[in-house]
Amino acid sequence: MQGFFWKTLLVVALCGTSSSLAHRPLSYGEALELALSVYNSKAGEESLFRLLEAVPQPEWDPLSEGSQQLNFTIKETVCQVEEERPLEECGFQEDGVVLECTGYYFFGETPPVVVLTCVPVGGVEEEEEDEEEQKAEVEKDEEKEDEEKDRPKRVKRFKKFFKKLKNNVKKRVKKFFRKPRVIGVTIPF
């Protein structure tokens, strides 16, 4: 009975120490590859994304037990997620979405954790384009209204109300989809 107790205690001690051992060193390049792999597998996108640019991190410490940060930009490729092709074979889409991402690695956690935040690039330019499109639509609508002057005022008011409603819905939908995507996963070391 006493031998069983010591064997059990030894197994429990080994399991406890193996989970608290230091993580495998992770170079900056490996961290970028892992972050991109996590994004492509967890973001729920139809297309794969590939690294466009990485901001060098001279303070990156592969042996750190604390948190590490990396910044990079990714772009949508022509490959679909279901294809499971290597990213090197995938070219960038001509008008593909460009995302600016920040990754945080927390090596002090057991198991280590990575959290990614990605936001679309060019939000201000898109808003200006949206405003120009809306102005063009308003001008077209005013021309149509001039042609349809014979309609009753009630119809004109309803038409104007529904146009405003439609534009507000469009704005909110675009704003909703511009929100950053945040992904958090544990790293299997």
UniProtKB/Swiss-Prot annotation:
Give the intrachain disulfide bonds: C79-C90, C101-C118
- Using the UniProt record, give the first listed, main subcellular location: secreted
Query: Which N-terminal stretch is annotated as signal sequence?
Result: 1-22
Q: Where in the cell is it found?
A: Secreted; Target cell membrane
Q: Where is the composition biased (Acidic residues)?
A: 125-148
SUPFAM superfamilies per record: Cystatin/monellin
In which tissues is this gene expressed?
Expressed by the venom gland.
Where does the record place the region Disordered? 125-152
Residue span(s) of the pro-peptide: 23-155
Coiled-coil annotated residue ranges, if any: none
The record's section on Gene3D superfamilies has:
3.10.450.10
InterPro entries membership: Cathelicidin-like, Cystatin_sf
The UniProt entry's sequence similarity note says: Belongs to the cathelicidin family.
Query: What's the stated role of this polypeptide?
Result: Potent antimicrobial peptide against Gram-negative and Gram-positive bacteria. Adopts an amphipathic alpha helical conformation, that may allow to partition into the target membrane. Low hemolytic activities have been observed on mammalian cells.
Q: What is this protein called?
A: Lutzicidin
Q: From which organism does this entry originate?
A: Bothrops lutzi
